[in-house]
């Protein structure tokens, strides 16, 4: 614990909490100040001036990062017949129907993404209390309720991320790993920023992005100048 605190203090000394860093500076600092002994995740956080209680100010969606996430997602698909075969051929890790419902209700959660064909949502709906709180419930807005299961599986395996504003209007997203080249992290960051900018609700008032941060697992938040993105 003492060693971790020492590393954290060393990281804090290199970061000026009053400064807005350019995206290139912020990414370089995030990599430099990472002290985790594993390939830490790199994440961004957007504090948005929105009121998520209003239906037209809820922000939620999905995108495929240009350089992936560095993470291999375990994909589960609820489908039957030909669609089940398509999912398997596309590389889905688990494909099934009621058998998977029983398994999940029994406590099994060894998957990262859940996809379903529209006709299976009545079955998947029985898992609302399990999948909902974990942000795993399939949703048309994130492309996880679809007839094109092959595309959904391939995107989930190839760097697709989902995002959603929480009650405080904060959106967090994974943009890669510390081991990524800096330019690839910058490219991913800029791609996500473009999505956030376009997601601005028409009814949002005042400054939309109040602050933007980048951090690594166990790392320190670094404030980024949105204008550099």
Swiss-Prot record:
Superkingdom, taxonomy of origin: Bacteria
Record Gene3D superfamilies: 3.30.190.20, 3.40.50.790
Keywords linked to the UniProt accession: Repressor, Ribonucleoprotein, Ribosomal protein, RNA-binding, rRNA-binding, Translation regulation, tRNA-binding
Organism: Streptococcus suis (strain 05ZYH33)
Matching CDD domains: Ribosomal_L1
GO MF, one annotated term: structural constituent of ribosome
InterPro entries: Ribosom_uL1_bac-type (IPR005878), Ribosomal_uL1 (IPR002143), Ribosomal_uL1-like (IPR023674), Ribosomal_uL1/biogenesis (IPR028364), Ribosomal_uL1_3-a/b-sand (IPR016095), Ribosomal_uL1_CS (IPR023673)
Function statement: Binds directly to 23S rRNA. The L1 stalk is quite mobile in the ribosome, and is involved in E site tRNA release. Protein L1 is also a translational repressor protein, it controls the translation of the L11 operon by binding to its mRNA.
Protein name (record): Large ribosomal subunit protein uL1
UniProt similarity note: Belongs to the universal ribosomal protein uL1 family.
GO biological process entries: regulation of translation; translation
Keyword rRNA-binding: yes
PANTHER family reported for this sequence: 54S RIBOSOMAL PROTEIN L1, MITOCHONDRIAL, LARGE RIBOSOMAL SUBUNIT PROTEIN UL1M
Assembly information from the UniProt record: Part of the 50S ribosomal subunit.
Gene Ontology CC entries for this record: large ribosomal subunit
Recorded name of the encoding gene: rplA
The UniProt record lists the keyword Ribosomal protein: yes
Pfam families: Ribosomal_L1
